[in-house]
Amino acid sequence: MSDQDNTQTSSSKLAPHHNIFMANLESSPTKDRNTSSQNASSSRVIESLHDQIDMLTKTNLQLTTQSQNLLSKLELAQSKESKLLENLNLLKNENENLNSIFERKNKKLKELEKDYSELSNRYNEQKEKMDQLSKLAKKSSAIEQSCSEKLQNMEVNYNSLLESQNLYRDHYSDEISKLNEKIGLLELELSNQNLNYGSDTSSNSDIELNLNKFNDSVKDLKSLETEKDSKLSKIITHSLDELNLQSWLNLYQTNENLISTFAEKMDLKDVLKRNDEKISNKGAVVQTLKKNVQTQVESNNADALSSNNAQDMLPIKMVKLRKTPNTNDSSSNGNSSNNKRRSFYTASPLLSSGSIPKSASPVLPGVKRTASVRKPSSSSSKTNVTHNNDPSTSPTISVPPGVTRTVSSTHKKKRNSMVVHGAQS
């Protein structure tokens, strides 16, 4: 349909030109060639002109044919151009669609890249966690092996302990049964012996009297100690009153001078004022030093008294003695059996004989018999030399043999240190 339309348009365009060309051909002078023979000279010129005209007509026809061909080609080119334009529009639409699709794909690709980066980070984190967990698993496996070995060892030890405990239980149960049998026999023997023993209580009464005497002597010793400590404290206070503190004051003065020189070098005005005030109040400084020494002496005496009282408080208990059996009784089983029973119940053979020997002294059992020796302290020798030898200051009392008077070492050290310090000053 498009080719027919192109041919119609080309024929409609060429029609007026063709009519003009044919009119020119009809009005050409070639028709009057026979009639116009009059002018011979001009005929040649006319013929040449006619030849030229023929040539021009031929060329014109050729040009028309060429123009028709060109028009047909132009129409074909136009049709192709229209087709190409249509194709171009279609391709543009397709290109736009492809661009939109491409943008969508790019967005999706970016999102996928983000997801990939996040997943890669998570993967790395999970990998690190897996490495840590693998290390922990290795450590836990090693610990588990060691614990399993320890558990096995503990099981073996536990089993061995159970076996040994069972063996010990059986052994000691047998021994306990034997001891119960022996105790029953001994109870029967003791019941028989108690029936045969008399009521001799003279030894117990003697021991009670001796204990009462000992308690009275201990009370007297405590009172003497308190009196002596009070006298010593008076002597120490008197010596402190007469004590010369000039060396301490000299040392204090040198320290104050050093502080004042240092303050002058460092431009410390407050320190200089304080030092001037302290130097002006020498009497107050001496009084404070005496008060400090007295408080220290009093505290030392209190500590010594408390330590002496704690050491002197000894527990005294009554010793129960067994009654002596009758040797002439027929129910006794002999001297050897009686001695064994007495040793079993910790009774001494001297006390069980019925009377206390004259050489034995009324002393508690277990107390060592030593001579009461007291070391003279340096403080008493320096302050009052005749104090220990004076009967008025150190009254005597009869102390039972075997009891030693002890003076606490801390009290001696504190008194000695105070008196020596005063002598040095």
UniProtKB/Swiss-Prot annotation:
For membrane topology, the record states: Peripheral membrane protein
Q: Where is the composition biased (Low complexity)?
A: 326-338
Would the keyword Lyase be found if you checked this record's keyword annotation?
no
- Which residues are annotated as modified residue Phosphoserine in the UniProt record? S343, S394
- InterPro entries per UniProt: She3
Q: Which residues form a coiled coil?
A: 68-197
Polar residues bias locations: 35-45, 345-358, 382-397
By its UniProt entry, which Pfam families does this protein fall under?
A: SHE3
GO BP terms, alphabetized: endoplasmic reticulum inheritance; mRNA transport
User: Any signal peptide, and if so, which residues?
Assistant: none
- List GO terms (cellular component aspect): endoplasmic reticulum membrane
Q: Which residues cross the membrane?
A: none
Region (Disordered): which ranges? Answer: 24-45, 322-425
Q: Where in the cell is it found?
A: Endoplasmic reticulum membrane
UniProt GO molecular function = RNA binding
Per UniProt, the keywords (alphabetical) are: Coiled coil, Endoplasmic reticulum, Membrane, mRNA transport, Phosphoprotein, RNA-binding, Transport
Q: Which family does it belong to?
A: Belongs to the SHE3 family.
State the function annotated in the UniProt record.
RNA-binding protein that binds specific mRNAs including the ASH1 mRNA, coding for a repressor of the HO endonuclease. Part of the mRNA localization machinery that restricts accumulation of certain proteins to the bud and in the daughter cell. Required for the delivery of cortical endoplasmic reticulum into the emerging bud.
Q: What is this protein called?
A: SWI5-dependent HO expression protein 3
Which source organism? Answer: Saccharomyces cerevisiae (strain AWRI1631) (Baker's yeast)
